[in-house]
């Protein structure tokens, strides 16, 4: 044998003596080109398996079935070992090519770690889904599969999903009878017609109030005084323009009018006389 071969064997023996039998086997297994290392699966669900396979074992390395929802031609960015914590391998797929599959529930159960700022991929597209009524965009939370709820980035042929939060359209209140109509209870509407007929018609005759509803009436209808009542009031006014309490009680008993009605009539009668005198005065002066 040549001297170079002897030197190589002596160096190997020294290394084996320093590291021990176990260390030498591990070193040889790592340095040997024929050692079979488990390669990180490209597109598959998380699977736990042994980190190293001893060389020369008859059992072939474990192969995982690819996810049926991911196209075979896609090439995602590689993910380092231990990225999501534990001894599991995982893969991150672009959102547009990810479709719902039966393994979604199994993937969502595994815990995940929030990646550091340096480990975030710059080529990953940013996606925001805006919901009506919320000021900020939807932010995905940890420990869930990174799948958008509302599809915003996708192929043109794929169907778009409508908003999951229904928003009722604004409908203004419609008043059938206009603003002049008197609305008492729910469901009461005036019949169509000219507004002056609805305004001057008697509310109690046109629409009788239903049971359990207090009808709000406008101005009370004026009841004219009889000739006998007016004669008694005019006679007292001619005697005294300001009525006293005793006279008011006597007239109230004689005319069947309330004391308030008599007081108001005397006030109106004084105003009327004042207007008549002012009109006569303006007509006589040149």
Curated annotation (Swiss-Prot):
SMART domains: HOX. InterPro entries: AP_axis_regulatory_Homeobox, HD, Homeobox_CS, Homeodomain-like_sf, HoxA13_N. Exhibits both spatial and temporal colinearity within the main body axis. At 12.5 dpc, is detected in hindgut, urogenital tract, spinal cord and tailbud. Not detected in secondary axes such as the limb and the genital tubercule. Residues 260-275 are annotated as: Interaction with 5-mCpG DNA. Keywords: Developmental protein, DNA-binding, Homeobox, Nucleus, Transcription, Transcription regulation. The keyword Transport does not apply. Sequence-specific transcription factor which is part of a developmental regulatory system that provides cells with specific positional identities on the anterior-posterior axis. Binds preferentially to methylated DNA. Belongs to the Abd-B homeobox family. This is Homeobox protein Hox-B13. It comes from Mus musculus. The lineage of its organism: Eukaryota, Metazoa, Chordata, Craniata, Vertebrata. The gene is Hoxb13.
């Amino acid at each position: 044998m040549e001297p170079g071969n002897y030197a190589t064997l002596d160096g190997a023996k020294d290394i084996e003596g320093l590291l021990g039998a176990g260390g030498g086997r591990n070193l040889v297994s790592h340095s040997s080109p024929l050692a079979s290392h488990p390669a990180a699966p490209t597109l598959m669900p998380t699977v736990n398996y042994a980190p190293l396979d001893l060389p020369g074992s008859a059992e072939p390395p474990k192969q995982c079935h690819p996810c049926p929802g991911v196209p075979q031609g896609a090439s995602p960015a590689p993910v380092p070992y231990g990225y999501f914590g534990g001894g599991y391998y995982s893969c991150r797929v672009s959102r547009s090519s990810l479709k719902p599959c039966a393994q979604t529930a199994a993937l969502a159960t595994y815990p995940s770690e929030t990646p550091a700022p340096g480990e975030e991929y710059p080529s990953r597209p940013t996606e925001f889904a805006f919901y009506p009524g919320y000021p900020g965009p939807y932010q995905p939370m940890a420990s869930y599969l990174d799948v958008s709820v509302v599809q915003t980035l996708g192929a043109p042929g794929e169907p778009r999903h409508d908003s999951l939060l229904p928003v009722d359209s604004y409908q203004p209140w419609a008043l059938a009878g206009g603003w002049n109509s008197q609305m008492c209870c729910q469901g009461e509407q005036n019949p169509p017609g000219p507004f002056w007929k609805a305004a001057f018609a008697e509310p109690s005759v046109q629409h009788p109030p239903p049971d359990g509803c207090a009808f709000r009436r406008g101005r009370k209808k004026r009841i004219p005084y009889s000739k006998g009542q007016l004669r008694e009031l005019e006679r007292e006014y001619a005697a005294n323009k300001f009525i006293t309490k005793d006279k008011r009680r006597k007239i109230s008993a004689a005319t069947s009018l309330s004391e308030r009605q008599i007081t108001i009539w005397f006030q109106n009668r004084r105003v009327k006389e004042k207007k008549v005198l002012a009109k006569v005065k303006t007509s006589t002066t040149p």
